[in-house]
């Protein structure tokens, strides 16, 4: 948004139907698209606003995806790389659902323990399970071997899994 005098002007027009993901930490908009599996050839009209000023965050990113409503599963993945994000579902230019993402207390089967000696690395029936220790910065602990992973490891795993 640009402010001229006393009025605000939109940098990007409103979308008729789709999803607006707001309050993404600055520089992570492309990671959000990656998590959603959006490469650019799917036919969705997408707007990215990167490093825009934010009163709450200093700088933030915004992603607008026309004609796509993201699923709960996709929202859960976004939470791990953009825990401050808000997801707005838009229909006929109106926000019909607004969800403030929250880091889950426990994450099962999404992340892998980097410890090669962890039982989850060697037993296919052991489901990797992580408990959130802190949200800022994001740190999680393996429930089996107590290995701690940080935000960088989490992003690396999630983005790596989506590039396969």
Swiss-Prot record:
The keyword S-adenosyl-L-methionine does not apply. One of its GO terms (cellular component) is aspartate carbamoyltransferase complex. Belongs to the PyrI family. Keywords: Metal-binding, Pyrimidine biosynthesis, Zinc. It holds the Pfam family PyrI_C. GO terms for biological process: 'de novo' pyrimidine nucleobase biosynthetic process; pyrimidine nucleotide biosynthetic process. Contains catalytic and regulatory chains. Its cofactor is Zn(2+). GO terms for molecular function: metal ion binding. The gene is pyrI. This is Aspartate carbamoyltransferase regulatory chain. InterPro entries: Asp_carbamoyltransf_reg_N (IPR020545), Asp_carbamoylTrfase_reg (IPR002801), Asp_carbamoyltrfase_reg_C (IPR020542), Asp_carbatrfase_reg_C_sf (IPR036792), Asp_carbatrfase_reg_N_sf (IPR036793). Involved in allosteric regulation of aspartate carbamoyltransferase. NCBIfam families: ATCase_reg (TIGR00240). Binds 1 zinc ion per subunit. It comes from Sulfolobus acidocaldarius (strain ATCC 33909 / DSM 639 / JCM 8929 / NBRC 15157 / NCIMB 11770). SUPFAM superfamilies: Aspartate carbamoyltransferase, Regulatory-chain, C-terminal domain (SSF57825), Aspartate carbamoyltransferase, Regulatory-chain, N-terminal domain (SSF54893). Zn(2+) binds at residues 113, 118, 142, 145. Transmembrane segments: none annotated.
């Amino acid at each position: 948004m640009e402010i001229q005098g006393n009025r605000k002007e939109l940098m990007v027009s409103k979308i008729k139907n789709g999803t607006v993901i707001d309050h993404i930490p600055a520089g992570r908009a492309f990671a959000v698209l990656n998590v959603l599996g959006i490469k650019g050839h799917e036919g969705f009209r997408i707007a990215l606003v990167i490093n825009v000023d934010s009163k709450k965050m200093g700088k933030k990113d915004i992603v607008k995806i026309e004609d796509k409503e993201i699923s709960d599963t996709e929202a859960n993945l976004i939470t791990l790389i953009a825990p401050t994000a808000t997801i707005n579902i838009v229909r006929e230019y109106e926000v019909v659902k607004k969800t403030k993402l929250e880091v889950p207390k426990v994450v099962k089967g999404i992340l892998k323990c980097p410890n090669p000696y962890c039982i989850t690395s060697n037993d296919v029936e052991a489901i990797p399970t992580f408990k959130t220790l802190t949200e800022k910065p994001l740190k999680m602990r393996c429930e089996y071997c107590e290995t701690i992973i940080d935000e960088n490891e989490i992003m690396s795993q999630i983005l790596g899994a989506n590039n396969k």
